[in-house]
């Protein structure tokens, strides 16, 4: 399980260095094989261990290519999906199209989301968090049934 927000830097080749605390788990669970794709709702990337991504691919394969909404989701997620392996230094290459989608510069955030990571540009992440906190504090939204039963 991945949790926490980690401020890290992209190197000049566009590689993200996975923090040490996650590396052994990724090596044990998937031999460092990762898949990165875009988030279709946010200006960030989604980085999955290969077995987690394969479950998503299975779900995507069940969508209808005749339904334009389902086809669009397949096109975006699969079209941007890039498989790679962490190198011995724990680095993973983010391709130029992926970096462009998320507006990634040198400073980025790697954010654990249980079974995957989100990758954000540092300044975009800060703006998103401020917006999310403000929305939660306003409570000007309707709680879903699941959230009504959720407590911390």
Curated annotation (Swiss-Prot):
Compartment(s): Cytoplasm, Nucleoid
Residues annotated as domain SpoVT-AbrB: 5-52, 81-124
NCBIfam families per record: division/cell wall cluster transcriptional repressor MraZ
A single cellular component GO annotation: cytoplasm
Identification of the protein by name: Transcriptional regulator MraZ
Pfam families linked to this entry: MraZ
Source organism of the structure: Pseudoalteromonas atlantica (strain T6c / ATCC BAA-1087)
GO molecular function (one): DNA-binding transcription factor activity
Protein family: Belongs to the MraZ family.
Key words, A-Z: Cytoplasm, DNA-binding, Repeat, Transcription, Transcription regulation
Family annotation (InterPro entries): MraZ (IPR003444), MraZ_C (IPR035644), MraZ_dom (IPR020603), MraZ_N (IPR035642), MraZ_sf (IPR038619), SpoVT-AbrB_dom (IPR007159), SpoVT-AbrB_sf (IPR037914)
CDD domains found in the cross-reference section: MraZ_C (cd16321), MraZ_N (cd16320)
Subunit structure: Forms oligomers.
Keyword Transcription: yes
Keyword set includes Acyltransferase: no
HAMAP family per the UniProt record, alphabetical: MraZ (MF_01008)
Chief location category: cytoplasm
GO BP terms: negative regulation of DNA-templated transcription initiation
PANTHER family documented for this protein: TRANSCRIPTIONAL REGULATOR MRAZ
